[in-house]
């Protein structure tokens, strides 16, 4: 009997030890896992518009990161925040990302970059598509940006003026051109100056038509029709780009030829001249990688956009009974037939 009792105690002791060891090991695993997650680099993404509006560009951004080994949830954590075309929300969501203690903050567009700049002077910021970063005071210079911001930039005035020139080349008789703008865009002043001089050189009259939000775009086209515009040009503004489909539809309904961003021609607009934005978003990963590996943003030169594309939509030209000069078609990077 004593032998039986003694063996029972021994068995229970072993089971207790095994069970206790398992619980102990499991308990050690969870903190280790949590700790490894906490060590993953944190990337904050500040979007001035919507994720749906970003489309292929956000895919390019993720692809660029993936090529360098950064996969959301596995080797990094990405926090996305979207202002949904409401620039007034940018300071709030920029502060929200700062409060998450991200290691690097990614912005697109000048309004988003400015909001991030005001929210933090210590967290590195990578701007993806800010217009004239030096002229707007975001960085000191392209080669030595200073502060906590680096990334890519392009010059909105020159791009928009080029659209006006292409429109004139495609439609030599055009006289009165509406310029569809978001007046809240920080690039508006220098762009208007460049557009005025370009319109004068091309012997065209320029009319400024404003739309701050997507709900104002339809009214903008009503104004174009009332003022007798022959054609229109779109400012390089994120809100307007994201609403390219509606703009193209309204242009078709009013039989107005227009020139704008790449997205505009893709969804039915006549002419597009634009920066290859997908390339810029993909390049953002290079800046992020350098910063996460210890390089200060002030020591990383700002890159200027160098890849541009001209697109002609011949389907739209046919619908508008327009004949596009062969010389322009031959120079186009893409022709939609």
PLM region spans:
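Short hydrophobic alpha-helices and adjacent helix-cap/hinge residues
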Residues: 1-337
